[in-house]
């Protein structure tokens, strides 16, 4: 089944090819039509391609995110190519095959044109002489019209007589004027194939041959010299074509010996006359003009009767016999000669027109396509090089980012451990120094000098100033002992941090790191708050005899227990509770289990209680002592006791009170300051930790800025690589498209411009 289908397709294809070949064989002018259609299509594609390339290059040149991969000169060049291609496309759209008919007046130029068109399009015959250039072209409309030179007005023409009348009525027309006669294609099939026929005034009536050639002949593909077979070639005719040959390289020239039907009246001289005309025309074409060789000359010289052909074709068009009417003998031979002329003319003009009209533009199109291809290739290479550079830069930044992250993690662990060691050392130094300063507190208090008075107002001021003195003195001494070493250690640590993190920063920031990281002079704040710490200090500067009962009890028991003993609070002495529940079966604890301190307090308390109950106790005791030692010893003892009391009472001055006050304050303040040694050491270590942590955090902030910049650069590189990938792909596509257009132009050249072997 598939084989049958393939054979059917082959048969259809063969039939189509045969039909196409038949059309080409039937009308060689189709060669130009198909070539024109092909080249117009190629130029349309070329224009679209250059438009796309120009837009692409302009967008690429304006893209500020990419480094320059194209130049403004390249953009302008491609835009220039676009305008050139558009201009060529407009020229190609107007291109057509052009044949120019020249000859002396009344040689039958218009009749030849009418015969070729199978209709009486141009005025001809007796009384009708062409007085200007007539350009006959086809129009898709159904009405004929004419256009005069310099005017866009379409003048309607329905018949040949109207055309003749219009041409003769226009007084502005002269021999060098051009009138375009647009005839419906439906009436003249020859005009459908982009063929333009140009009739001219007789070349024997003007001397403006040079201007005619420049104005009307330079774009002609074929020249037809319509000669009168009843006479030989005139010098005027030869002179004109000599000028044409000087302006154009090897012009295509046909010679029609018209009115050959007159030879039928003298048949005995026909061949001799034909031979003479052939020799002279061949000599003119070959020897004088050099446009053909002798082998080709026979295909350029014809003997016809245009009037007979026109009459026969008009009759045939009207449905009458072709040979009807009064026709001279040999009509069929002359008809065949005219048809042979038409065949040779069509083949010549189609080949010549394709070559002259399209070859130069084809070469120019190839040059433009190649130029744009080279631009796209250079852009592709530049984008590829930039992409490789971006990939290398991205890899470098990614490696840098990984190095920063790893190094920052290691440094953070190391600095965290070192900060911990430094803070512990600071706490130890401050605690040791403060303990030593507390032991020397009495010296600091003794250095305090201010007028002392026991009045409450003066004492309040005295204590406030003493607090300030202690605060400043302790702070100064601690600063002298600790601050310098701690500050030096802190600065060393900060410099180590800077040196460790500096390699993680970009080179531009390394020299500015000292300005970026604040380096304030660090000062420890000990913050002892002596005024609040000693706010509840209660001095005792009343006179107390050293051998008095209260002082003795205080000396043995201490201030706290003596107060309890003297006030009779023995019942409030707390026994320690047993750690286990009491067991009735167990014997009570022995009395000796009481502590020695509790026993002493109990005894003295009992004694004091006894003496306080009755004065008789004193008498009893005194009597007992009296009996034991005698009155003299007692009297002496009381005398010495009294003298000692008087001495101490007299020496209890303001200075003594101040010394007692300072001694009491030293004891009290020392006890209080001992409580905050650990707190002060921790506070100082916390300050150092905050300072070092702040420095490290600020350095890390700069590193984070560097990391963010690297991440942004990596993201920008990724975006740039994507843009370059797209750019490369587009440039490669456009480069390949230029190659495809070049292959299309090569195919066109091979098919239409190169001579067939």
From Swiss-Prot:
Main location: mitochondrion
Superkingdom assignment: Eukaryota
Region (G4 motif): 258-261
Broad enzyme group: hydrolase
Record key words, sorted: Apoptosis, Autophagy, Coiled coil, Developmental protein, GTP-binding, Hydrolase, Membrane, Mitochondrion, Mitochondrion outer membrane, Nucleotide-binding, Phosphoprotein, Transmembrane, Transmembrane helix, Ubl conjugation, Unfolded protein response
Alphabetical list of InterPro entries matching this protein: Dynamin_N, Fzo/mitofusin_HR2, G_DYNAMIN_dom, Mitofusin_fam, P-loop_NTPase
Any one of the GO BP annotations: positive regulation of vascular associated smooth muscle cell apoptotic process
Residues covered by the Dynamin-type G domain: 93-342
Compartment(s) of residence: Mitochondrion outer membrane
Free-text function comment from the UniProt entry: Mitochondrial outer membrane GTPase that mediates mitochondrial clustering and fusion. Mitochondria are highly dynamic organelles, and their morphology is determined by the equilibrium between mitochondrial fusion and fission events. Overexpression induces the formation of mitochondrial networks. Membrane clustering requires GTPase activity and may involve a major rearrangement of the coiled coil domains. Plays a central role in mitochondrial metabolism and may be associated with obesity and/or apoptosis processes.
Record-given protein name: Mitofusin-2
Upper classification of the organism: Eukaryota, Metazoa, Chordata, Craniata, Vertebrata
């Amino acid at each position: 089944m598939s084989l049958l289908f393939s054979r059917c397709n082959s048969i259809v294809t063969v039939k189509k090819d045969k039909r196409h070949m038949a059309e080409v064989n039937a009308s060689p002018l189709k060669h130009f039509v198909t070539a024109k259609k092909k080249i117009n299509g190629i130029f349309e594609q070329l224009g679209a391609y250059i438009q796309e390339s120009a837009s692409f290059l302009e967008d690429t040149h304006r893209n500020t995110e990419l480094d320059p991969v194209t130049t403004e000169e390249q953009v302008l060049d491609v835009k220039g190519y676009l305008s050139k291609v558009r201009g060529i496309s407009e020229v190609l759209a107007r291109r057509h095959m052009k044949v120019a008919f020249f000859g002396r007046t009344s040689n039958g130029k218009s009749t030849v044109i009418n015969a070729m068109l199978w209709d009486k399009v141009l005025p001809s015959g007796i009384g009708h002489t062409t007085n200007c250039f007539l350009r006959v072209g086809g129009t898709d409309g159904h009405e004929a019209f004419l256009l005069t030179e310099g005017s866009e007005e379409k003048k309607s023409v329905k018949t040949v007589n109207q055309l003749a009348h219009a041409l003769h009525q226009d007084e502005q027309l002269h021999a060098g004027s051009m009138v375009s006669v647009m005839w419906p294609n439906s009436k003249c099939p020859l005009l459908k194939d982009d063929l333009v026929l140009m009739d001219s005034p007789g070349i024997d009536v003007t001397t403006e041959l040079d201007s005619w050639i420049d104005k009307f002949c330079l774009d002609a593909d074929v020249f037809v010299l319509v000669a009168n077979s009843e006479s030989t070639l005139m010098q005027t005719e030869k002179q004109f074509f000599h000028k044409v040959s000087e302006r154009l390289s090897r012009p295509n020239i046909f010679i029609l010996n018209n009115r050959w039907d007159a030879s039928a009246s003298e048949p005995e001289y026909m061949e001799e006359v034909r031979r003479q005309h052939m020799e002279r025309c061949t000599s003119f074409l070959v020897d004088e003009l050099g446009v053909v060789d002798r082998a080709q000359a026979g295909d350029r010289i014809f003997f016809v009767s245009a009037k007979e052909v026109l009459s026969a074709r008009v009759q045939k068009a009207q449905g009458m016999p072709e040979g009807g009417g009064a026709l001279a003998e040999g009509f069929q031979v002359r008809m065949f000669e005219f048809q042979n002329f038409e065949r040779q003319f069509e083949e010549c003009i189609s080949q010549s027109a394709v070559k002259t009209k399209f070859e130069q533009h084809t070469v120019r199109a190839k040059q433009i396509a190649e130029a744009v291809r080279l631009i796209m290739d250079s852009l592709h290479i530049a984008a590829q090089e930039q992409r490789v550079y971006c990939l290398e830069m991205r890899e470098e930044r990614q490696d840098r980012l990984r190095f920063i992250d790893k190094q920052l993690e290691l440094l953070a662990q190391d600095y965290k451990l070192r900060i911990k060691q430094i803070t512990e050392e600071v706490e130890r130094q401050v605690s040791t120094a403060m303990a030593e300063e507390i032991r020397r507190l009495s010296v600091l208090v003794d250095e305090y000098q201010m007028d002392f008075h026991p009045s409450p107002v003066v004492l309040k001021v005295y204590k406030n100033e003493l607090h300030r003195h202690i605060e400043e003195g302790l702070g100064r001494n601690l600063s002298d002992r600790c601050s310098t070493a701690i500050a030096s250690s802190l600065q060393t640590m900060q410099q180590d941090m800077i040196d460790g993190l500096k390699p993680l920063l970009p080179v531009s920031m390394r020299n500015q790191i000292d300005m970026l990281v604040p380096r304030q002079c660090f000062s420890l704040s000990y913050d002892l708050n002596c005024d609040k710490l000693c706010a509840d200090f209660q001095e005792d500067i009343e006179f107390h005899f050293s051998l008095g009962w209260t002082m003795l009890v205080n000396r043995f028991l201490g201030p706290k227990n003596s107060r309890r003993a003297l006030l009779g609070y023995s019942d409030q002495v707390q026994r320690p509770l047993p750690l286990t529940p009491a067991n009735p079966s167990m014997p009570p604890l022995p009395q000796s289990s009481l502590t020695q301190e509790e026993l002493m307090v109990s005894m003295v308390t009992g004694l004091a209680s006894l003496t306080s109950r009755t004065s008789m106790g004193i008498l009893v005791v005194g009597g007992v002592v009296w009996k034991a030692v005698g009155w003299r010893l007692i009297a002496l003892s009381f005398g010495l006791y009294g003298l000692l009391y008087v001495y101490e009472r007299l020496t209890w001055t303001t200075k003594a009170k101040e010394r007692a006050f300072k001694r009491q304050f030293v004891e009290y303040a020392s006890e209080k300051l001992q409580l905050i040694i650990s707190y002060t050491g921790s506070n100082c270590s916390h300050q150092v930790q905050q300072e070092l942590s702040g420095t490290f955090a600020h350095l890390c902030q700069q590193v984070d800025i560097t990391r963010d910049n690297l991440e942004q650069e990596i993201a920008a590189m990724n975006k740039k690589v994507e843009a370059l990938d797209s750019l490369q792909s587009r440039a490669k596509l456009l480069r390949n498209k230029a190659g495809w257009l070049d292959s299309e132009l090569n195919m066109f050249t091979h098919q239409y411009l190169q001579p067939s072997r």
